[in-house]
Amino acid sequence: MTTSPSATGTTAPGATAPGATAPADGLGGPLPHTLLTAIAPATWGTFYVVTTELLPPGHPLFAGLLRALPAGLIALAIGRTLPRGSAWWGRAAVLGVLNIGLTFPFLAVAAERLPGGVAATLAAAQPLVVALLATAVLRERLSAWRLAWGVAGMLGVGLVVIGPAASFDPVGIAAGLGSAASMALGVTLTRRWGRPPGVGPTAFAGWQLTAGGLFLLPVTFLAEGTPPPIDGPALVGYVWLGLVGGLLAFVLWFRGLTSLPVTSVAVLVLLSPLVAAVLGAVVLGQTLGPTQLVGFGLALAAIVAGQLPAPRRGGGRGGGG
């Protein structure tokens, strides 16, 4: 296993993140990168069906741990590259805790104390938080276009997943917003710092998954105690979450974050509750009524609009997407 070259500078606002230029992988343009990155939140949308149908109840942190730590160790073995220098060891730890170590427990608390639809809608606030953070951390101009479609996307997700009997537990709401804020800050810092030169997306994801998994290890056993027995269906579920929802998804996600505009990537998280709703209809026999279909269309429109530059104003200056 080798160590990565050191990187002393940070990614300049508006510049391509270190080690992530589009021509290097031969994909040729932003659309293939966007489609590959979208696989990540789409696979995260399977988490709800896998959890309810395959995993033992009452152990969401254990599921998060198995989603992160084994995937991180596998990615490290494949990438065979460790951080070099105290700066990147520290950055890998910070990003791992923000993107995974804090996000997963917050999600678990929100899912436990709120109806799934409310929790999903709070998570859909992430594009708005990223748009605000990008102005402070990346020095990007705050775009009314991004904000408007971020609100539209959150509203669309709410129409899809929130039922008339939804309850609003304050602790659950705080946890849901904490999850969105934690991952939004992690996403923004990932874009700010980029990847060190010579480090591929698999190794980069491995650093963060391992750091987040190690953070989750004591938290899980303190909060949930002894792990549950794992039968055949649970084994299938944990393997899916680890290899697909963990390893594959986060490699593609972090790859996209260092090769695409951060606000464009952030809005892709809206795919997660939409995929969950589709699987609920197909696998669990749930129905999507007219209001939900309208919300579905609104959220999809927000995802597409989030990949486009803001319309030019009448005089000719760009909107600054």
Model region roles, listed by residue range:
Residues A42-T51, L76-A123, A131-L133, L159, ...:
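Specific transmembrane alpha-helical segments of multi-pass solute transporters/efflux pumps
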Residues L54, A63, R67, A110, ...:
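Hydrophobic/aromatic residues within transmembrane alpha-helices
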Residues T2-P5, G19-P30, L66-L69, I162-G163, ...:
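C-terminal-most transmembrane helix of multi-pass membrane proteins
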Residues G64-L66, A119-A125, L189-G213, G246-V282, ...:
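Helix-helix packing/entry segments at the starts of transmembrane helices
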Residues M1-L65, V109, L155, A165-R192, ...:
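Glycine-/small-residue-enriched transmembrane alpha-helix faces in small-molecule transporters
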Residues F62-L73, L107-R141, R146-G150, S179, ...:
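Specific alpha-helical transmembrane segments that line the substrate/conduction pathway
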Residues V49, A71-A75, V130-A131, G150, ...:
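Transmembrane alpha-helical segments that form core, pore/gating elements
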Residues A75, L133, L142-P164, S179-M183, ...:
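Hydrophobic transmembrane alpha-helices of multi-pass small-molecule transport proteins
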